[in-house]
Amino acid sequence: MLQQTQVKTVIPYFNNFTQKFRTLKSLSKSNDKEILKMWEGLGYYRRARNLLECAKILVKKHKSRLPRSIVEIKKLPGVGDYTANALLGLVHNEPRIAIDGNVKRLFSRNLNIEEKNIDFDKLIEKNKINLFKTKRNADLVEALMEFGALKCKPKDPNCITCCLNKTCKYFKSDKKINNIRNKMIKNKNYDIFCRVNKKQQIALTRNNQISFLKNFNLPEMKETNIKAIDKNWKFLINYKNSISNLKLNINLYYKFSNKLPPRYNWYSLKENKEFVPSFTKKILKKLITL
């Protein structure tokens, strides 16, 4: 849940999730609809699907235990080097370091070398004798991430009171590296076409064409092409939406129709027991006034 999402946002979701699924086995018996409904509003829904698949695999193939082999762990859906090392360190107390953005920044500043010029795997291997003196490897994994997040912050790090400033080349140097990452923002224009029936329901389908909204329930959605718009569609509103590094400029069109196109289902504009992503909810709110 914490991947790409702030702690304060995650806390209520985490509490509800762990209250509902108290064991790996109970989670493995769930399904996409239930998991996504509980995840609704957190975004990055692939995480939820991967978590469910991981639970099923661990229960079925590993007797509800996390493997000790990094090769086996990386076979789990959505698990790469970072997550695998974090799991081995936190769960099995192995001498591992989970290299996330906070840890990279911490090491990079300590050496006063830009991240792009550091091979972090080689750096850890070279310094493993000093790094892994402790037997509390799980604490080390978490401490490095927390230190980078709370002390060695991206902007305005509090270097004067930092316990590492005696060895930190960033602190001592007059020529400091720049650790601020500029996000590459992409602008995209889309037209969304909403079919609404007399019962105040909207026709939605599972999208498999727009990559950043894959598997979401959406109305018809296409890249903007004013010339191709049928006259039966009425323009409702233009609005902006942001998803990750994308800025979307959206034209919303609608028409009243009781005819349901193939592979579409009716969803209420007001309340849905099934999972509806935030992106689609914004559309529903704009249509309620019709």
Protein language model regions, located:
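Catalytic cores of DNA base-excision repair glycosylases
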Residues: 2-160, 164-167, 173
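Intrinsically disordered, low-complexity, charged terminal extensions of DNA damage-control enzymes
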Residues: 146-290
